[in-house]
Amino acid sequence: KAKKLIRELRKGMGRNTTQCYDFKTKDATEYKVCVFVDRGNIRKFYFDMFIYCKETNDYVCATSLLDEENSAEQFSYTPHFLRRYAERALGVDNMSINRVLAHIEREIAYTVLIYKNDASKVVATSMGLFLQKIDYKRGINICKTFVSVDMLKSSQIKAYMVVADLIKEYSERYNKVQRNDNVRVDFTNDCLSRGITEKDLVNAYGEYFKNKR
């Protein structure tokens, strides 16, 4: 599959390409494998694998995101989240799950936690906000729905803008060094060097909830 994508990338003009493929084992376990290929390093490829969990109806990523403490955390996408992402980020109804996953893998390279409480988290991305529910039993952050930037309230926008430029910068660096060279970038230390702390982000987004009461 990766070789096929490399051939497609060589024929086209795109900077990178991503495709998502279905895979099922003999015991009927369903997987979705997203393969990312970058023109700048065409001999290498990056992939994420999602396992479908029928009991909870979500796609659990076998790889990890970085939380604010720079430690690995597992996450999953619900079908509802993927539908809302397609509708609100891409303006498309009834997009296939594979196409939505491929777009997320291609366009969202880095995320930043900007709010959390005992039950939920809010993660900022280049496309908008992921609203997550914490599943303590499974140790997974479940992405329940997606909020595009144009839907944000004024206090939410303030929190988002604090990290928007950094997300863009880190997305470019992530694509360059982490996806291709497997070198981890440290967002937390960079934020601290710019005078931005986790408390700043949480307080900014938290104003939205204070004003809502």
Language-model-derived ranges and their functions:
Residues 1-213:
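Ribonuclease/tRNase effector modules and their secretory precursors
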